[in-house]
């Protein structure tokens, strides 16, 4: 347990960088893969030439997120047990729902939304994203209580940026509006993740800074 706490910041940094960069790295080996229009999960479909690498990479990053949560809980526990439970729990849920399950559940490119595997993946991924958004929300609130205006603003911008980008990503499925966003669907998904991962990275750096004291 002590080892997991010690390496928690490293696990979290590797999880964030690994999960965010994986689509760009594997996309180079997928002929015709367009980062602007295609969503990340398409790398794991049965027709993808990098399916195995994507699934294995998702399992690794998901495991790293989960392992990092032990140190995250310990870091916030001294301030608030409730805060520690929610933040660490959100990271665990994200690692499991959006990463591990992505790597374990194989989805056909022809599967409909009501296909059990597709629905399970979509449901857990959505829940995981919402859970992860509680991280900047709570950290912004915590910073505001301490009158740390710049820190509070940073987390608030991350939350609002992620929500706005996620809305534009999901709006693809809406009539009329969807056709206008078809050429930027992949961009909005990645931008939402970018804003979502910044607070997680900040936690890792805060842990490292705390250890140097």
Language-model segment annotations:
Residues 211-213:
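Short, Lys/Arg-enriched, Gly/Pro-containing loop segments at transmembrane-helix junctions
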Residues 3-33, 39, 43, 47-198, ...:
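Hydrophobic, aromatic-enriched alpha-helical segments typical of multi-pass transmembrane helices
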């Amino acid at each position: 347990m002590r080892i997991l706490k010690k390496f928690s910041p490293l696990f979290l940094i590797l999880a964030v960088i690994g999960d965010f960069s994986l689509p760009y790295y594997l996309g180079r080996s997928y002929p015709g893969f367009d980062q602007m229009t295609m969503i990340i999960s398409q790398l794991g479909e049965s027709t993808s030439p990098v399916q195995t690498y994507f699934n294995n990479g998702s399992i690794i990053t998901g495991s790293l997120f989960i392992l990092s949560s032990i140190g995250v809980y310990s870091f916030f526990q001294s301030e608030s047990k409730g805060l520690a439970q929610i933040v660490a729990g959100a990271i665990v849920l994200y690692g499991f729902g959006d990463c591990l399950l992505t790597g374990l559940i194989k989805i056909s490119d022809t599967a409909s939304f009501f296909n059990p595997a597709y629905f399970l993946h979509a449901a857990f991924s959505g829940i995981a994203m919402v859970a992860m958004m509680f991280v900047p929300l709570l950290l912004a609130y915590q910073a505001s209580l301490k009158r740390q205006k710049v820190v509070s603003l940073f987390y608030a911008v991350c939350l609002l940026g992620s929500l706005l980008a996620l809305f534009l990503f999901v709006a693809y499925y809406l009539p009329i509006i969807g056709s206008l966003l078809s050429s930027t669907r992949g961009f909005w998904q990645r931008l939402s993740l970018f804003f979502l991962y910044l607070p997680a990275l900040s936690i890792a750096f805060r842990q490292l800074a705390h250890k140097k004291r």
